[in-house]
Amino acid sequence: LDEATDHVLYATLEDDMVENSRIYELRDEDGTPYVVSVLDNQRHFAGYLNQIWQLIRLSGVAVRHDRSAISANHHHYAMMLGVHDLGLTTLRPYGVADSSESSVLVLHESPKATPCDVQGMTDADMRHLMRYINTAHRRGFTHRNITQNALARLDDGTLFLCGWQNGDYASGSTNVALDKVELLSLFATVFGVERTVAAAREAWGDATLINLIPFVQKAAVPAATRALPGWDKTLLEQLRKTMSALAPEEVSESLEQVTLSRFNARSFFAITLLVIAVGVVLTQMKPNEMIKA
């Protein structure tokens, strides 16, 4: 289902990756340009279904579920303002307004963001993004969807994370850990495990990496990262092994994997088919006639 929703949901950097929005250009009477992002309830529904799927799929993880476009846009606006107030780079939101079942998010056109050439990133760039997200985490902000598409640069080359719509504030330790694992798994897929862990040791320290080991598992990695050319089934095992080497032996042996996934898509569909099969059998048995008998 994760892979399927990737084809249903589309987003652009112009409005900080609002899923399925309509984009317009606007100039005020002074000629100042703005980006106008309109999100309709009907278009937001696919994003809402994806949130619900994550809520069902993940255990012990807080997941947003914004039923309306208005709720989603208001939250996104608040997130961007909050991240900006931390001194972190974001696109500049101007305001938000609602009309019927649609919500309008207005952003300053400048500075503009462009997709980051991930292959061209340096170790310093990796450390910069790791410290960026760590600053957000210290104040309770989590992104919750760190993929290659969330990495962007401003006109002056400043590297930052975009797409805060599904993030949240007052986040718990599990969501903080998952953010870091999303970033680690992305970098490990693109740059390799050794290079990624070396950068993370400088940015976060060994203690943080050791505490992340129980969360390094497939359920924590976005489908978009698992679709990258550098991904393979052994990558997370290599990442856990390299991170475990940082811990004393007695600590490493005591670190048990946290249960994040209630079930996978295969078991979900198997349960669905089982329910359908039971329904068919019961129908064929004609329960009404059995009751009368």
Listing of model-derived features with the role each one plays in the protein:
Residues L1-M17, D30, A220-T283:
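Regulatory N- and C-terminal appendages and interdomain linkers associated
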Residues H7-L13, E109-P111, P115-D117, Y169-A170, ...:
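Soluble, non-transmembrane catalytic domains of enzymes that act on hydrophobic metabolites at membranes
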Residues Y10-Q42, L186-F215:
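Internal hydrophobic scaffold segments of catalytic domains
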Residues E19-V106, R138:
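Conserved ATP-binding subdomain of kinase catalytic cores across diverse folds
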Residues I23-L26, V36, P93, L107-P115, ...:
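Structured N-terminal alpha/beta-domain signature
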Residues N73-T90, T114-N149:
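Conserved kinase catalytic-core helix
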Residues H143, L154-R226:
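C-lobe/activation-segment region of protein kinase-like
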Residues M285-K292:
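Membrane-interface helix termini and inter-helical loops of multi-pass transporters
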